[in-house]
Amino acid sequence: MNVIEQLRKEEADRLLAQRKVPEFRPGDTVRVNVRIKEGDRERVQAYEGVCIARAGQGVDENFTVRKISFGEGVERVFPILSPMIESIEVKRRGVVRRAKLYYLRDRRGKSARIAERQMTAASKEEPAEKSEA
């Protein structure tokens, strides 16, 4: 591992220790609370939509959220470790078989829906077991 990769890994570990980032995948509906500066004031705005992609790794990791606002599709790319993100909440888990859901851009109405992933008791316990090991 070269020096730059080592520095990026250390920085990502440091930032992840400070901030709690939930585990989510493309297809999940997420609410991202973003800090917005307007002049000398700062407020928090919620942006809720479907995560259609995750890209990068470490410090450079980002995700794309798509929502429909007044009949128009709006997409926004957020860096996971951005200081402008106050929190990320997973509202719904979706069942998809793709890592990138760009095909949703061409879909309208019911065909753009994503089925909800059913959480069983075994799948809820599984992540806890992985973190202990």
UniProtKB/Swiss-Prot annotation:
Gene: rplS
Any matching Pfam family: Ribosomal_L19
Compositionally biased region (Basic and acidic residues): 123-133
GO cellular component, as recorded: cytosolic large ribosomal subunit
Keyword Ribonucleoprotein among record annotations: yes
Keywords of this entry: Ribonucleoprotein, Ribosomal protein
GO biological process, one term: translation
Annotated InterPro entries: Ribosomal_bL19 (IPR001857), Ribosomal_bL19_CS (IPR018257), Ribosomal_bL19_sf (IPR038657), Translation_prot_SH3-like_sf (IPR008991)
Name of the protein in question: Large ribosomal subunit protein bL19
Role of this protein: This protein is located at the 30S-50S ribosomal subunit interface and may play a role in the structure and function of the aminoacyl-tRNA binding site.
Residue ranges of the region described as Disordered: 114-133
Similarity section: Belongs to the bacterial ribosomal protein bL19 family.
Cysteine pairings via disulfide bonds: none
